[in-house]
């Protein structure tokens, strides 16, 4: 199981999407945390050792980029649907997962990011 020992935080206001990510990533051995709001994401990042963040651009009434601006060293994949990620924003993240994405895309992206050397949550 490639995910053993790695923690993934899924930040999205879509309950079904978070559940889909959680179930599939847990089957691969990842520990998965879920945040339906920017505030919950910030709380989890302060209290948990997170390796990979899957971050929706628009999280409810919050702004996913607000969380992105607070991250120090987590590996980040940005979720986006109709929103076009400009070159500057793309440079701030490690990967972009365009909705709808396949489970293979999810698995490969998280696996690639989790395999990188990094030191867990560095939330400011």
Describe every region a protein language model picked out:
Residues 34-52:
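Acidic, metal-coordinating helix/loop segments flanking the phosphotransfer/catalytic sites
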Residues 79-81:
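Hydrophobic/aromatic residues positioned on beta-strands within the core alpha/beta folds
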Residues 99:
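A Lys-centered signature of the CheY-like receiver
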Residues 60:
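The feature encodes the CheY-like receiver
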Residues 37, 63-66:
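Acidic catalytic/metal-coordinating carboxylates
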């Amino acid at each position: 199981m490639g995910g053993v020992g790695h923690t993934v935080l899924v930040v999205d206001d879509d309950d079904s999407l978070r559940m889909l990510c959680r179930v599939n990533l847990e089957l691969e051995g990842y520990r998965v945390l879920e945040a339906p709001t920017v505030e919950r994401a910030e709380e989890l990042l302060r209290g948990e050792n997170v390796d990979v963040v899957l971050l929706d651009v628009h999280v409810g009434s919050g702004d996913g980029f607000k969380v992105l601006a607070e991250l120090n060293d987590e590996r980040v994949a940005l979720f986006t649907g109709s929103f076009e990620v400009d070159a500057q924003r793309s440079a701030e993240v490690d990967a972009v997962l365009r909705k709808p994405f396949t489970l293979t895309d999810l698995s490969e992206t998280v696996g690639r990011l989790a395999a990188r050397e990094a030191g867990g949550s560095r939330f400011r």
